[in-house]
Amino acid sequence: KPLVDLIIDGSIQGVAVIAGCLSSKVQTDMSFVTMAKELLKNNVLVLATGCAATGCARHGLLNGEAMDLVGDSLRGVLETLGKAAGLNEAMPPILHFGSCVDNSRCAVLASAIADYLDTSIDKLPLVASAAEHVVEKAAAIYMGVISLGITTHIGVTPKLGGSPYVINLLTTELENITGSTLIIEIDPK
């Protein structure tokens, strides 16, 4: 309920999950880090799993020292949550949600929020990103996330070029089926 209330009152503009493996096609961690900084600045709560979380940690985004990167309303939320949790400081700007095999925790959270609001997941202000995805398991995961109704971004062009039908299905038609779509965008900003 508190998370939902903060989204409804505009203190949090939405929730983004960043996940995925590192890719040798881009500078290590930079897609995750650049995107996370932009999201935080715009008062979007960021959850991270797996290599994305580790990359953000390497750049200091999972501790209180990164609070200067956070928008005003999200900063207030993190400070309030930190006090409520008995910490002497704000909650970290990015919340670590576990290893890559724990991505389902984010789906459980999305489902619980949708159930609480008596709506479908695709109506929630949620997005997922595998900005540096590199292995086939990432494709299986992001297709599962899209099937739940969560629009998903990938930052490395996938090997989908064999069929215009498949490309159209993934980037356009899925929205008619699941309420969400696949966004392919290499620039993390």
Regions found by a protein language model. Name each.
Residues 1-189:
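Anaerobic metallocofactor- and corrinoid-dependent redox/one-carbon enzyme cores
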